[in-house]
Amino acid sequence: MRFDAFNGDADGLCALHQMRLAEPAETTLVTGVKRDIGLLKKIDAQAGDEILALDIAVEKNAAPLAALLEKGVKVRWFDHHNPGELPIHPNFQATIDTAADVCTSLLVDRHLDGAHRAWAVAAAFGDNLHDAARRAAAPLDLSDEQLGALRELGECLNYNGYGDSLEDLHFHPADLYRALRPYADAFAFIAEAPQFRTLREGYARDMARARAVPAAEIRPSGAVYILPDEAWARRASGVYANDLASAHPTRAHALLTRSPKGHFVVSVRAPLANRTGADELCRRFETGGGRKAAAGINVLPEARIPDFVAAFFKAYPEA
């Protein structure tokens, strides 16, 4: 059997789409909301089976990965998150790059020699890597309108991944991938797919509500926002953090969204002018992790909000 384990955001979706356009296969899809990255524990694979893992951290899957490799399962991995210690095993192949201007879809694009570049461009835009997206798009000779369409596609696919549970999402990420699968041409998906229209409309509604929320604390070096326990807030949290980062490139941003379970889910974006420190900040808190430019905390107790805010402004002090 073959399994595709992928992050449910734009980067995971577009990475998988590129791979399966290049290497068609019938596989079992294993995915979830964007923050559900401990996916290998959900896979019951046997000797000779194959797993393709995309845009999920090795570190968060270390124990099940070791067990699967010892059982004789072959695992290929593409990712841009901090991997921790990588296993050395003949059944394991990894392409990992944690540079701040790289996403998993760009790594897959590199692996495939640009065979399906437009999807990688969309994913890079979705990950708020605008400069990297434009560099990748340069050989495609796209118009400004086409480049804008890929940006909107990436942002909408990314938006669908955010939520406390699958019930918050417009589409289960596996179903959204199945909607992408018939389309080698990203522009055809944009023009024809009803799923894209649903995401575009939902994105506009949810972002309008998010932009109406005032900052809880704002300084020249950073801003903290607290969003309510509402499905729209959970869907908008990550994409609104990206939006704020783009609008204020010298400022860091943190969005704390109340979960139905009572804790807060945190999204952090380093300043675009200095894409570093987000992962180190979040890793100081249990359930925290991510990338240098963009990271998060899955469970922040309300009592620890003052500790987090203090650590945030210490990580991003005023000049």
Regions found by a protein language model. Name each.
Residues D44, C103, H172-D175, A179-F189, ...:
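Short, solvent-exposed coil/turn linker segments
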Residues F3, V75, C156-Y159, A174, ...:
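Generic intrinsically disordered, low-complexity segments enriched for polar/acidic and small residues
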Residues V58, G161-P173, A191-R205, R235-N242:
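Short N-terminal helix-initiation segments at or just after the protein's N-terminus
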Residues A133, A137-A184:
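Loop-centered beta-sheet repeat module
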